């Protein structure tokens, strides 16, 4: 291991990553030492080399983690919410201390460039700060009763164990969006990370363990690592988990929704995106080009909010095409941990195959390759970012391909552009570049974008935690972060107090008993 990574060993050692790691943890000192379920190998997508291995969680391990999480919940729910917020504050501070190393591990294991890896950890810090504030704002409502000498109010209580099933593309941030808000609401969390990025989860759990141990609080953060077909299925079928937050494909999200709803559990679904930018005839091209390039190329097109389609006014097409191609020539592809790299590899060989298949489908439909269009030979899962002139109705354009493929189309009338924009099954993020106020307002109105996120003069990716994140249609309808996101992690209770001497019934009903 030392020979393979040299200076990169410092990243692993700092975060408590060994050559072989256990795959289930219920808190400080609670790593279950099961080895019989086989290994999950973590592969560096930039080189194809083994980073480290993780022993998969067993059924007994899972059961042990759930039982301990249930016991932790019984105590944690009694802790005042502002005090719970102080623990999350310390989690944020610990993440500040580990930001450089954890950001590097995200880059090493997932493949996004170092700046984006650090940015993902910063998202964790930001949501921690946000959750601390929210811990003092879990507001209920009071209302007047129609009955004399009565008072009514609504209050909120924690749910219990929140299950978080996250995807490889944001291997640490998505957990924090859920776990920190769930924690200030009085819940515990069990996390099943992507089996593609298990080391990131182990590192985060180790950081959690440090904070939990230092504060002598219940073990509210737990991790179970294993294949989705085993550990994931167990989680979504487990009625002891009243809430499951799932991030992943639309196909798997539909399955999760069906299984959890059958047991009347709650879900937060963050699924596919087919995000689009409309560029009208008044757009400032000096900000359009970098916005499209970052949206399409950032994280090698593996963000849920990656820009996948551009619909440009006829009069702007040639300028946009030429300037965008020049910009793509400047994208330095290489080791995500090296300074100056703007695009790293795809996460694995399957992702490269999906990229190549999508290119072939687009070409067979009549697509014109304007830039790229091929994978890169050699070590690692590298591809060339690709621009294709296409039509919105093509099957491949209607699908989400998790890769740096950008489809460009033209329009002459804004209503036509909006119809094309909305004419896909997904509805996550959208943007319009314009200096025309009427066009901007129309795009943001009820007859405009049908997405959960709609922007003006800013791209489709790079959402901030202060606003609700999520989408419509096959994106799943879930929302994370934002002003009232805490309500998803709590149950609402209506209370009526009679402080008088009589028992009037609602709606003036009379129910006289003769004694």
Model-identified regions with their sequence ranges:
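Hydrophobic face of amphipathic alpha-helices that form TPR/SEL1-like repeat modules
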Residues: 1-46
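Residue-level signal for inorganic ion chemistry
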Residues: 48, 84, 106, 186, ...
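Conserved C-terminal structural/oligomerization subdomain of aldehyde/semialdehyde dehydrogenase
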Residues: 47-52, 217, 241, 278, ...
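Short, well-ordered beta-strand elements within core beta-sheets of diverse protein domains
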Residues: 50-57, 71-78, 164, 277-280, ...
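Glycine-rich loop-to-alpha-helix module at the N-terminal edge of alpha/beta enzyme cores
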Residues: 49-138, 149
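A short acidic/small-residue loop/turn micro-motif
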Residues: 33-34, 39-40, 56-60, 283
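Rossmann-like NAD(P) dinucleotide-binding subdomain of oxidoreductase/dehydrogenase enzymes
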Residues: 140-287, 411
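ALDH superfamily catalytic-core signature
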Residues: 207, 251-392, 414, 419-420, ...
């Amino acid at each position: 291991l030392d020979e393979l990574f040299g200076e990169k060993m410092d990243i692993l050692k700092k975060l408590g990553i060994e050559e072989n790691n256990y795959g289930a943890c219920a808190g400080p000192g609670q790593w279950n030492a099961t080895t019989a379920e086989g290994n999950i190998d973590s592969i560096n997508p930039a080189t194809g080399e083994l980073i480290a291995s993780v022993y998969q969680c067993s059924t007994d391990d899972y059961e042990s983690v759930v039982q301990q999480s249930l016991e932790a919940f019984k105590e944690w729910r009694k802790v005042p919410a502002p005090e719970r917020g102080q623990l999350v504050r310390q989690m944020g501070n610990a993440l500040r201390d580990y930001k450089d190393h954890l950001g590097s591990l995200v880059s090493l294991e997932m493949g996004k460039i170092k700046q984006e890896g650090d940015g993902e950890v910063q998202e964790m810090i930001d949501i921690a700060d946000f959750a601390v504030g929210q811990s003092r704002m879990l507001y209920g409502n009071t209302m007047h009763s129609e009955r004399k000498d009565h008072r009514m109010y609504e209050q909120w209580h924690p749910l219990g164990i929140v299950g978080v099933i996250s995807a490889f593309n944001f291997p640490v941030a998505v957990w924090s969006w859920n776990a920190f808000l769930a924690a200030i609401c009085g819940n515990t969390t069990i996390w099943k990370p992507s089996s593609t990025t298990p080391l990131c989860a182990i590192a985060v759990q180790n950081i959690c363990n440090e904070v939990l141990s230092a504060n002598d609080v219940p073990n509210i953060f737990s991790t179970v690592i294993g294949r989705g077909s085993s550990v994931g299925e167990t989680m979504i079928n487990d009625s002891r988990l009243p809430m499951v937050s799932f991030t992943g494909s639309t196909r798997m999200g539909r399955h999760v929704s069906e299984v959890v709803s059958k047991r009347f559990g709650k879900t937060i679904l963050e699924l596919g995106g087919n995000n689009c930018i409309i560029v009208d005839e008044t757009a400032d091209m000096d900000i359009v080009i970098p916005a499209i390039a970052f949206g399409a190329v950032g994280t090698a097109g593996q963000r849920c909010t990656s820009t996948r389609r551009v619909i440009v006014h006829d009069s702007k097409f040639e300028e946009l095409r030429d300037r965008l191609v020049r910009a793509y020539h400047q994208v330095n592809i290489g080791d995500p941990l090296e300074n100056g790299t703007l695009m790293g590899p795809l996460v694995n060989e399957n992702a490269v195959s999906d990229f190549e298949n999508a290119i072939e489908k687009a070409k067979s439909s009549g697509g014109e390759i304007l830039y790229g269009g091929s994978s890169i030979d050699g070590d690692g899962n590298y591809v060339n970012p690709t621009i294709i002139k296409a039509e919105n109705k093509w099957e491949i354009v209607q699908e989400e391909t998790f890769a740096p493929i950008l489809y460009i189309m033209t329009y002459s009338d804004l209503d036509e552009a909006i119809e094309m924009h909305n004419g896909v099954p997904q509805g996550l993020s959208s943007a319009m570049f314009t200096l025309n106020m009427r066009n901007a307002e129309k795009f943001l109105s009820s007859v405009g974008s049908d997405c959960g996120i709609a922007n003006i003069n800013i791209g489709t990716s790079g959402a901030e935690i202060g606003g609700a994140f999520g989408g419509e249609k096959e994106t799943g309808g879930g929302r994370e972060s934002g002003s009232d996101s805490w309500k998803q992690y709590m149950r609402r209770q209506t209370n009526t107090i009679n402080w008088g001497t009589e028992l009037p019934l609602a709606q003036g009903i009379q129910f006289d008993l003769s004694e």
